[in-house]
């Protein structure tokens, strides 16, 4: 029999409010509204479908403080992670958010109303206290703490929800089950004992082995329940991961395993998150849950030490297992024995027996360089999916981002580089010349710091999309401010290579080379806040290459860039 939901009743607000959704939708159109963030959208979906039972809304102050301080709601039920709706002072004033007010919550993708919140209270959370107690340290190296201090707004709104409609999904719809649907699916399959496996990473042979062992030891079936909401920054995208999971599923014994996707926004909260994950799986009807070593750990703190001990998560779920109400299965690390061609638990390896493993870092290196990935480590079908999403360097996109004063020679080098790269004929090459991007992307902008930063952000977005598509993007703005350059790098490098090239031609030479007389116009006061004259140029301290056109020719400069790309494998043989 499927497990009883946390709190005794599954809070499926879609079912509860099904008879009045038409009237709720009509009312929502008349109400002040809040457009949700991506994390709030994930939280709302699990509030509405019962995944966060017993919650029926975002935490009010009393529940919030209880969860932060004692891991309990005001009614005494165990709950470890605050589920809050953060808003700004401006949103409060604009929507007149106050107790008893009804607010429509809108999907950020299409602005459709998803729910109506009846406000109970508005309060200012103690973010440092939340960071210290929930996540173990007020350290912004932790992604959830960084979110608290740098992204989350200053106030929380607590209140109860009514469901208008569910968020739309257009990907992997057949694998998205609400708790109600998954419980019905288990009933149809006549599954009475189900082990759930949580993951935010691709799965390989070792994962298949450890999950099969867990299911066999418990005489249970298996639910692969990966997170497809928000995970740790830098994780592999969920589209790739789901293709991996689908490639892996036929490797399980027939009828043993099912795949269901969980739209959860992870906090990487370690021990507390492990308890939270177990409660969520309990609500989805499973009877057992695998908790791993350093479960949901974010890695190192700002001092280079792990935020959590390797077994803290397992210890906390063990402490509260009677309240969690499902059996916790400790994650068994397995390792490959080439002598016997099998995976065996790491703690059962006889002394002197050779074992093999490939780390995540080594796997990424092999994917980037095109080196073989042995079949003992992963299935060919899985490797094929990963190679499609992670081609070798000479098939990846990259951006060459020039920075330097006006008339420093950036455009001449950029155009020559475009011609040189076109000789390769292995990828599309796009040049975002400064005069073109000003005219086509930022014609309404001036030369203030704010306008320059916006201009750079727009160019970085375009370059990032080109890089994502496997093209070579050449960008040649002045880009005088380090903060904007660093933001551009962050935008682009998640999709491929990024090289900052400083064209360090002296100001005096730039003035001599200025055929358009821009510097003279700036000196006469016709152009305000002009870089190099009455606005600063922050010299890069992190450039990948520095070029002075007075000391080398355009051809020499291009050759240096080509050598840099060749060294890193972006051009030439894989």
Curated annotation (Swiss-Prot):
What GO CC terms are in its UniProt record? cytoplasm
- One GO molecular function term? sulfate adenylyltransferase (ATP) activity
Q: Which SUPFAM superfamilies match?
A: Nucleotidylyl transferase (SSF52374), P-loop containing nucleoside triphosphate hydrolases (SSF52540), PUA domain-like (SSF88697)
Q: What does this protein do?
A: Catalyzes the first intracellular reaction of sulfate assimilation, forming adenosine-5'-phosphosulfate (APS) from inorganic sulfate and ATP. Plays an important role in sulfate activation as a component of the biosynthesis pathway of sulfur-containing amino acids.
Does the record bear ATP-binding in its keywords? yes
Q: What HAMAP family does its record include?
A: Sulf_adenylyltr_euk
Annotated compartments = Cytoplasm
Protein name per UniProt: Sulfate adenylyltransferase
The record describes its quaternary structure and partners as: Homohexamer. Dimer of trimers.
- Name one matching Pfam family: ATP-sulfurylase
Q: What InterPro entries does this protein's entry cite?
A: APS_kinase, ATP-Sase_PUA-like_dom, P-loop_NTPase, PUA-like_sf, Rossmann-like_a/b/a_fold, Sulf_adenylyltr_euk, Sulf_AdTrans/APS_kinase, Sulfurylase_cat_dom
Keywords assigned by UniProt? Answer: Allosteric enzyme, Amino-acid biosynthesis, ATP-binding, Cysteine biosynthesis, Cytoplasm, Methionine biosynthesis, Nucleotide-binding, Nucleotidyltransferase, Transferase
Chain positions of site Induces change in substrate recognition on ATP binding: 331
For biological process, the GO terms are: cysteine biosynthetic process; hydrogen sulfide biosynthetic process; methionine biosynthetic process; sulfate assimilation via adenylyl sulfate reduction; sulfate assimilation, phosphoadenylyl sulfate reduction by phosphoadenylyl-sulfate reductase (thioredoxin)
Activity regulation note = Allosterically inhibited by 3'-phosphoadenosine 5'-phosphosulfate (PAPS).
Where, by residue number, does sulfate bind? 198, 200, 296
């Amino acid at each position: 029999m499927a497990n009883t939901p946390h709190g005794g009743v599954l809070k499926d607000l879609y079912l509860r409010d099904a008879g009045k959704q038409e009237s709720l939708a009509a009312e929502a159109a008349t109400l002040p509204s809040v457009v949700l963030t991506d994390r709030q959208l994930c939280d709302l979906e699990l509030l509405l479908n019962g995944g966060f039972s017993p919650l029926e809304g975002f935490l009010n102050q009393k529940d919030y403080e209880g969860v932060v301080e004692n891991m309990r709601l005001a009614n005494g039920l165990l709950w470890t992670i605050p589920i809050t709706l953060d808003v700004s002072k401006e949103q409060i004033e604009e929507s007149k958010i106050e107790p008893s007010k009804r607010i429509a919550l809108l999907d950020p993708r299409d602005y459709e109303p998803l729910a109506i919140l009846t406000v109970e209270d508005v309060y200012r959370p103690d973010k440092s206290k939340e960071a210290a107690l929930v996540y173990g340290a007020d350290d912004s190296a932790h992604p959830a703490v960084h979110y608290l201090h740098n992204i989350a707004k200053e106030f929380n709104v607590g209140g109860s929800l009514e469901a208008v409609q569910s968020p739309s999904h257009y990907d992997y719809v057949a694998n998205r089950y609400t708790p109600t649907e998954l419980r019905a699916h288990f009933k149809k399959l006549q599954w009475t004992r189900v082990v759930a496996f949580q993951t935010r990473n691709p799965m390989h042979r070792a994962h298949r082995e450890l999950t099969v062992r867990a299911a066999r030891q418990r005489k249970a079936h298996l639910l692969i329940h990966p997170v497809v909401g928000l995970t740790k920054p830098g994780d592999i995208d969920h589209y790739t991961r789901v293709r991996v999971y689908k490639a892996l599923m036929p490797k399980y014994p027939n009828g043993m395993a099912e795949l269901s996707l969980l739209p959860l926004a992870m906090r990487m909260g370690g021990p507390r998150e492990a308890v939270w994950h177990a409660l969520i799986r309990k609500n989805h009807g499973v009877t057992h849950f695998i908790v791993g070593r350093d479960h949901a750990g974010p890695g190192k703190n700002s001092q280079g030490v792990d935020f959590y001990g390797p077994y803290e998560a397992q210890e906390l779920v063990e402490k509260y297992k009677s309240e969690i109400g499902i059996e916790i299965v400790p994650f068994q690390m397995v390792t490959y024995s080439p002598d016997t061609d099998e995976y065996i638990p790491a703690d059962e390896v006889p002394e002197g027996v050779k074992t093999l493993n490939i780390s995540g870092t080594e796997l990424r290196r092999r994917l980037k360089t095109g080196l073989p990935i042995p079949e003992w480590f992963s299935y060919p079908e899985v490797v094929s999916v990963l190679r499609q999403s992670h081609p070798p360097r000479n098939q990846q996109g990259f951006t060459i981002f020039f920075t330097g004063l006006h008339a420093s020679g950036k455009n001449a080098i950029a155009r020559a580089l475009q011609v040189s790269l076109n000789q390769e004929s292995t990828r599309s090459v796009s040049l975002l010349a400064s005069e073109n991007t000003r005219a086509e992307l930022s014609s309404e902008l001036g030369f203030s710091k704010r306008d320059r930063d916006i201009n750079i952000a727009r160019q970085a977005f375009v370059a990032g999309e080109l890089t994502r598509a496997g093209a070579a993007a050449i960008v040649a703005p002045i880009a005088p401010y380090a903060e904007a350059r660093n933001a551009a790098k962050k935008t682009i490098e998640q999709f491929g290579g990024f090289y900052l090239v400083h064209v360090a031609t002296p100001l005096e030479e730039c003035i001599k080379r200025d055929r358009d007389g821009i510097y003279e116009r700036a000196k006469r006061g016709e152009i305000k806040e002009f870089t190099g004259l009455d606005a600063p140029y922050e010299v890069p301290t992190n450039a990948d290459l520095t070029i002075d056109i007075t000391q080398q020719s355009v051809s020499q400069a291009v050759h240096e860039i080509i050598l840099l790309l060749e060294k890193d494998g972006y051009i030439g043989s894989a």
